[in-house]
Amino acid sequence: MASRSLASISRSASRLLQSNVQKCALPAASIRLSSNNVESKKGIHTGVATQQAAAATKVSAKATAANASGRIVAVIGAVVDVQFDENLPPILNGLEVVGRSPRLILEVSQHLGDNVVRCIAMDGTEGLVRGQPVADTGDPIKIPVGPETLGRIMNVIGEPIDERGPIASKNFAAIHAEAPEFVEMSVEQEILVTGIKVVDLLAPYAKGGKIGLFGGAGVGKTVLIMELINNVAKAHGGYSVFAGVGERTREGNDLYHEMIEGGVIDLKGKNSKVSLVYGQMNEPPGARARVCLTGLTVAEYFRDQEGQDVLLFIDNIFRFTQAGSEVSALLGRIPSAVGYQPTLATDMGSMQERITTTKKGSITSVQAIYVPADDLTDPAPATTFAHLDATTVLSRGIAELAIYPAVDPLDSTSRIMDPNVVGQNHYDIARGVQKILQDYKSLQDIIAILGMDELSEEDKLTVSRARKIQRFLSQPFQVAEVFTGHQGKFVSLEETIRGFTMILKGELDHLPEVAFYMQGGIDDVFKKAEELAKQHGN
């Protein structure tokens, strides 16, 4: 009985509650109805006003988003977590820590939830505290671009670090950009003539190609880079960009002063041919992971806006990968093989795909590559190799013979060494030169044990021509005139092919091999031979 009475009480209470709700709802419904009638009387004017108000709200929301401010909630090494009350900044936006000198820029990398974004710091995070205010800049990191950057050194965020005042550029560009569309790309394969005989003949560079430069310390890598910068400027009127990624500060400083001495950088006038972007070894991983993109952005401006053939040097591309792996671990990503970031191929691909030839101009990239423990199967160099069009190998053995540039003619390769691209004559001469050098290499053991006298007449001729070719592959550089005392030479591709054709045909067998050393074209060899003949005649 008690349960039935309780049930009846519950039902009556429920009916009473529903009737009260309906009574309360009636006035609200009538209010909504009357307001709708009023709005319908106002007509089209109210609709327009509503649209304008909505548009104004959107604009104000955008403005608020651009100037959104947050506060630091966590600092984990080079990674900083920032919380925003509203209007989260998008991925890759730049944030600036308020009231900090020098400026500290953070780049948004992840959205964590609870209005928290995880950022990568572009400078040291020493002294940061929780609660410190952070402002959204409203854009990705932007840097100055254009002719004003020539002869200057800047860091990853575009600030000058050469103590020569601000960079007075009117143009700025974001360091993150899409690769050119397929329709914008040039399909023609064309040689970028460097004026360096051994490169142009045996491992030519393609316009818009990527070249791996392998070389240890002291084999002439820096001098080769400077000569390439100088020759591209003179032959093509093009500019160069040098990105020092994870460089030793001392080496970066030495390169800068050598460029001033070599005339590549003009401190007094406006004849500088190169822009420098440095993210040294002591910089945090965020800066080293992005300085590549800063240099590439400077090069893209010259290609897209000025139609230039730009040369982009990256030293060292391995440090780009290394910095990415450091950042990846701090961001909480699960590492892949050998501890590298799981996004290794994506990071490398998104950067390398921007280096290409378009219908406006080209970016040709020369990338120094460090191979960890000489293991070519390591994921970092292996990922880089997939993007290369040519390899230029500098050999210590050739440098010990005082043959500069010390490029190994047998190890260096190029994808465009193809008769359909370089022409049948060029291809045949290059392969003929390599065959003679390979034959000479295989005869060296016999020569070392038995001597030259035990060789056949044919082998003696091969050795004689190979030694002339080896010496003719040397060349005086314009930027090295102060070291060598020889006047630098720029040798055209036609002149290079003519010279080696004459050697292969035996037309120069009567000339002494010393006449071929440190000469430009074949005409210089004839002059040297005449001088030697006069000296011996006297």
Curated annotation (Swiss-Prot):
Cellular localization per UniProt: Cell projection, Cilium; Mitochondrion; Mitochondrion inner membrane
Tissues of expression: Expressed in three categories of adult male sensory neurons: tail ray B neurons, HOB hook neuron and head cephalic (CEM) neurons.
EC top class, as a word: translocase
Disulfide bonds, paired cysteine numbers: none
CDD domains per record: ATP-synt_F1_beta_C, ATP-synt_F1_beta_N, F1-ATPase_beta_CD
GO molecular function ontology, one term from the record: proton-transporting ATP synthase activity, rotational mechanism
Gene3D superfamilies: 2.40.10.170, Bovine Mitochondrial F1-atpase, Atp Synthase Beta Chain, Chain D, domain 3, P-loop containing nucleotide triphosphate hydrolases
Entry GO terms, CC: cilium; mitochondrial inner membrane; mitochondrion; non-motile cilium; proton-transporting ATP synthase complex
The entry's keywords: ATP synthesis, ATP-binding, Behavior, Cell projection, CF(1), Cilium, Hydrogen ion transport, Ion transport, Membrane, Mitochondrion, Mitochondrion inner membrane, Nucleotide-binding, Transit peptide, Translocase, Transport
Binding locations of ATP: 215-222
GO biological process: dauer larval development; defecation; defense response to Gram-negative bacterium; determination of adult lifespan; embryonic morphogenesis; gonad development; inductive cell migration; mating behavior
Statement: the UniProt record of this protein carries the keyword DNA damage: no
Enzyme Commission number, as recorded: 7.1.2.2
Pfam family, one: ATP-synt_VA_C
Reactions accelerated catalytically: ATP + H2O + 4 H(+)(in) = ADP + phosphate + 5 H(+)(out)
InterPro entries: AAA+_ATPase, ATP-synt_VA_C, ATP_synth_F1_bsu, ATPase_a/bsu_AS, ATPase_alpha/beta_chains, ATPase_F1/V1/A1_a/bsu_N, ATPase_F1/V1/A1_a/bsu_N_sf, ATPase_F1/V1/A1_a/bsu_nucl-bd
Record's subunit section: Subunit of the F-type ATPase which has 2 components, CF(1) - the catalytic core - and CF(0) - the membrane proton channel. Interacts (via N-terminus) with lov-1 (via PLAT domain).
Function as written in the Swiss-Prot or TrEMBL entry: Mitochondrial membrane ATP synthase (F(1)F(0) ATP synthase or Complex V) produces ATP from ADP in the presence of a proton gradient across the membrane which is generated by electron transport complexes of the respiratory chain. F-type ATPases consist of two structural domains, F(1) - containing the extramembraneous catalytic core, and F(0) - containing the membrane proton channel, linked together by a central stalk and a peripheral stalk. During catalysis, ATP synthesis in the catalytic domain of F(1) is coupled via a rotary mechanism of the central stalk subunits to proton translocation.
PANTHER family in UniProt: ATP SYNTHASE (PTHR15184), ATP SYNTHASE SUBUNIT BETA, MITOCHONDRIAL (PTHR15184:SF71)
Entry similarity comment: Belongs to the ATPase alpha/beta chains family.
Protein name listed in UniProt: ATP synthase subunit beta, mitochondrial
Natural source organism: Caenorhabditis elegans
Originating gene: atp-2
